[in-house]
Amino acid sequence: MRKILVTNALPYANGDLHLGHMLGYIQSDIWVRFQKLQGNQCIFVCGSDTHGTPIMLKAKSLGITPEELVTKYSNRHLQDFTDFEINFDNYHSTHNSLNKEIVEDIYNKLNNKNLISKKAIAQAYDPEAKMFLPDRFVKGTCPKCKAEDQYGDSCEVCGATYDPTELINPRSVISGQSPIQKNSEHFFFDLPALEKNIKDWIESNTLLQPEVANKLAEWFEQGLQSWDISRDAPYFGFAIPGTNEQKFFYVWLDAPMGYIASFKDYCNKNNINFGDFWGDSSSESELYHFIGKDIIYFHTLFWPAILSSTGYKTPTSVFANGFLTVNGKKMSKSRGTFIQARTYLDNLEPSYLRYYFASRLTSRIDDIDLNLEEFVTKSNSDIVGKVVNIASRCAGFIYKKFDATLSGEIFDPELESEFSKNHDAITQAFEKREFAHAVRLIMALADKANQFIDYHKPWQLAKEEGQEQKVHQVCSQGINMFKVLIVYLKPIIPSIVAEAERFLNIQFISWADAPKFLINHKIDKFKPLATRIEKEKVDKILEDTKKMLENEQAPQSKKEEPKLDIAAECTFDDFMKVDLRIAKITEASHVEGADKLLKLILDLGGVTKQVFAGIKSAYKPEDLIGKHTIMVANLAPRKMKFGMSEGMVLAAGDGKGIYILEPHEGAQPGMRVK
C-alpha cells in the first residue's frame, strides 16, 4: 500500500468559484479516488487562501470585516466542492492559529540560517488611496514583451516576472492614478542561495511535466532573484514577528504553508503521524501538488527551496493543468460563458461536467475547451446512450424472468477476457493522469458490450420458445460488462456509480476486482441512473450567467438617507449641565404593582443611588446585576409612589426594544462621561 498525500491549490476566498476553477479540482479528485480504489492510503487536503489586500479592500467596500468575508466565501466554496463531488479529507483555512504557528516557525528557521535579509526598496504607492500597492493592484505594460494590461508581478502573455516598479505606464487598480515610488524596508528570502537545492529536486523528479521543466530551465537562465516576502500595513494577514504589525507576510509565503496546516489538522483529528508523510525522512511517502499553470513559479522554485531548508519533504511532483475556455474562447461574462460553479449546479448534475472534463484531460498542460454543443452530445451519447443503456436493456429480463439472479455461467468467455485484458491499460492511464485515454478505452469496451447485446437481441429471444437459458446468459453477461465499466468510471462519476452499485447489490469492489464477473448474484430492480441533457438546460445556464452580469452592472438605486427626529438644538453649555456618570448595578428587583419598572441600586464609586427604570419588558433583574451602565447623576430626585428615584439610566430604543447603554471595558464607577 502506497502512502500518498495530495493537495490542491487553495481557492482565494474573495469571490465565488467558476468552472475554470472546477477543472483543476475535478482532475485531482479523479486521481485521488482512483488511488483510494486501489487500496492506497491517499489523503486529500485543501483549504481557503484568505490573506492579502484584495480581501481587505473588498471587505471594506462591503462594510464587513475580512474575517467575515473569508468565512462567507470559504463556506460557499466548500458547498460548491461538496456538490461537485470533490471529496477532500480535510478543508482548512490559512487564517488560522495553526497556520500562523507554522508560518512563524518556518520563517524563524529561514532567518536562523541567514536566508532572510532586510533592505529598503522603492514601492508603488497610491497617494490618493494613501497605501502601498500590492503587485496585483498595479497594472501596466509588460517590460519584457510589451503586452498591455498586465499585473505588477508577472505577465500572463510571456510568463515573465518583475517588480511593479518595472511596469511601463503603471496605474493603480484602486484609484486609476499613476502610483509614485516610495521607499520602504522589506524582508527578502535568499532564493539564489538555494539554487542547488532546487536543481537537485528537479533532477530527482521523474514525474515533472516537460512544460514545467522547460519553464524552470528558462527561469534559471534568467537568474534567480531574492524574493520579497513582506508587505506593508495596512494588510490582512500575519504580522512578521518584531515589526510592531507594520510589516506582514506576503500571502504567497503563508498560502502554500496552508497545505501543511490542513494536513497537520487532519493528522491531529485522526491520530496520524505527520512525519510519516511530510517529515524530511519520510522517503516511503509521496507528496503531490495539483495546481493551475499560472502558479508554477511559486510551487516549483520558492516552495521546494523553503521545504528543503526547513526540514520538510519536498514534493514528489507538481502537476499543473491548463485554463478553461468555453466554445473556443476565453470565458466571458458578456457572452454568458463565465459560468459560476453554483450556476451550473442549479441546472445540471455534476456527473456530466466531471465526465466531459475527464474525456479531455491529459497529463500535459493544455488548455481545455468546454464546447457546450459537444458537452451535451458526449454526455447523452456516452453516459446515457452507451453505459447506462447496457443495464437498462438487460436488467428487466433478469429481474422479472430469473428471480433477479445472474447466470451461473459465462456466455462469452472471449469477450469477458477482452474486458479483463484492458484492465492494466486503463489502470496505467489513470495513474499517469491520462484520463482522456482511459475514457476512450472504457467507451470502446462499452461499444463492444452494446454490439454484443445488439447481435443477440435478448428482447427477440425472450419471445422464442426454448431460448430462456440463452436470454439469461446474454443478459447476465450484459449486466456483468456494465458492472466492469462502472467500476472503471467510479473515479469520474461517483454518484451515478453509487446508484449503479445499489442496483447491482454490491457494497464495494476494489479496483483489482473490477474485471471479475458476478456469478449467481442477486441484483435489485433497475431504476434510471441518468437522464439526457436537454439543450434548454444549457441555454438557461448561459441566460442565468448573463443576468448575473446585468445585476452586477445595474446602477444601484440611491437609498434615501434616513431621517432622524432630532430634538431642539441645545448649546454646549446646556449639554455640560448634564452630569453623566459610569454606574455599576449592584442590585436589581421587580417593583410590586408596576408593569414597566425595575428598581436599580447603582454604585457611582462609593456613592449609592436608587433609580426606577422602565426596562422591565427587556431585562430580567438577575441579568443586570454586575453590569456597568451610564446614568444622569444630577437629575433632580423624583418622588414616586414606589419610592424616591435619584437619577436616570440611559437606554436606546426604536419602539420595538429597549437597550441600556454599557460603557467600554475599563470605564470605572464614578467616572464622568464627557
From Swiss-Prot:
Single GO MF descriptor: methionine-tRNA ligase activity
GO cellular component terms, semicolon-separated: cytosol
Keywords: Aminoacyl-tRNA synthetase, ATP-binding, Cytoplasm, Ligase, Metal-binding, Nucleotide-binding, Protein biosynthesis, RNA-binding, tRNA-binding, Zinc
Domain tRNA-binding intervals: 574-674
Signal peptide: none
Residues binding Zn(2+): C142, C145, C155, C158
Note on cofactor: Binds 1 zinc ion per subunit.
Cofactor(s) needed for function: Zn(2+)
Residue ranges of the motif 'KMSKS' region: 330-334
Amino-acid positions noted as binding ATP in the UniProt annotation, renumbered to this chain: K333
Reaction equations catalysed: tRNA(Met) + L-methionine + ATP = L-methionyl-tRNA(Met) + AMP + diphosphate
Pfam families linked to this entry: Anticodon_3 (PF19303), tRNA-synt_1g (PF09334), tRNA_bind (PF01588)
UniProt subcellular location: Cytoplasm
Oligomer and partners: Homodimer.
Function summary: Is required not only for elongation of protein synthesis but also for the initiation of all mRNA translation through initiator tRNA(fMet) aminoacylation.
Assigned protein family: Belongs to the class-I aminoacyl-tRNA synthetase family. MetG type 1 subfamily.
Name of the protein this chain belongs to: Methionine--tRNA ligase
